[in-house]
Amino acid sequence: VVKGEMKTGLIWHTQGSGKSLTMLFTAWKLRTLAELNNPTILIVVDRVDLDAQITETFGAVKLPNTTRASSIDGLRKKLKEDRREVIISTIFKFDEMADVLVQRENVIILIDEAHRTQEGTNAAEMRRALPNAFFFGFTGTPIDKSDKNTHRNFGLKPDGKVERYMDLYNIKAAIDDGATVPVHYQ
């Protein structure tokens, strides 16, 4: 992000490995980098329960300048007012946001469960509203099909080649580490 070389990236961390905490500490680090000129960090989730969970997680560590978008209008207002903070929102709050809200390049979007939300209208509206933003997808189950492809949405390098993952911690790695117990059926 500091160098501005890659505008997208995909992080595959298996379920239960701490994606929310990784997002939290990533947001914290990005907010403190002077080179980013006080960026806006947008945390995007796809379910109301995840919205509440991640808001609670961020609140527990008292990440400064963190707020939750409570409505479509609330999110639109926060973005239009050039708020330099961490904003937590569901993807659905981008419904009917066809206008450009922020032109700045120091807007960084961390998308939880990226494999589920980036093929539809709301994702297109989010990208249209924030055309110069950085988009980083977090997933435990990337999809690699012709009609839905997490790698295509987040793994393209400036030269058009696909960079599969910025970081990879899959189920095999979790089992090897002892963080996940394998299940055997008889």
For every predicted segment, state its role.
Residues 1-186:
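RecA-like P-loop NTPase motor core of helicase/translocase proteins
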